[in-house]
Amino acid sequence: MKLSKYIVIAFITLAITSCGNKAESETVEAATVVANGLANSTFKVWGNCDMCKETIEGSLKVEGVSKADWSTETKMISVAYDTTKITLDQIQKNIAVVGYDNEKYKGDDVTYSELPECCQYDRR
């Protein structure tokens, strides 16, 4: 029951904050819900296509991450992970290492330049 309350509060908070000034900031990290060491986080990762999706999600096929789903439309990734095995910071670094910018880290420049042309996006 307590977990349900936390999830509802997190989603209400997210809904309220995301309805505000969209022009002010493109990078709003969603709330992280943690219960018993398991967390769900949503944040922005720049990319373009299904090849990007495969690479981004593939970078998170590591111990501790049980789900990673990146949307080509919204550029948001939803990640379910075990906080006793991996941190959100490590998750964001893993994505940057394969060449993709996210809210916290810029993708590796050399790796980015080696991405297929369809995967190269306007960098911030």
Q: Where do the model's predicted regions map?
A:
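Hydrophobic helical h-region of N-terminal Sec-dependent signal peptides
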Residues: 8-13
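Short, low-order "capping/linker" segments at domain edges
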Residues: 113-124
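C-terminal motif of bacterial Sec signal peptides marking the signal peptidase cleavage site
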Residues: 15-18
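Bacterial N-terminal signal peptides that target proteins for export
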Residues: 1-7
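Post-signal-peptide N-terminal segment of Sec-exported extracytoplasmic proteins
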Residues: 36-76, 97
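Conserved short beta-strand edge segments in small beta-sheet-based binding/regulatory domains
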Residues: 99-111
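Helix N-cap motif at beta-to-alpha junctions
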Residues: 82-88
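Short, low-complexity, disordered segments immediately C-terminal to signal peptides
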Residues: 20-34
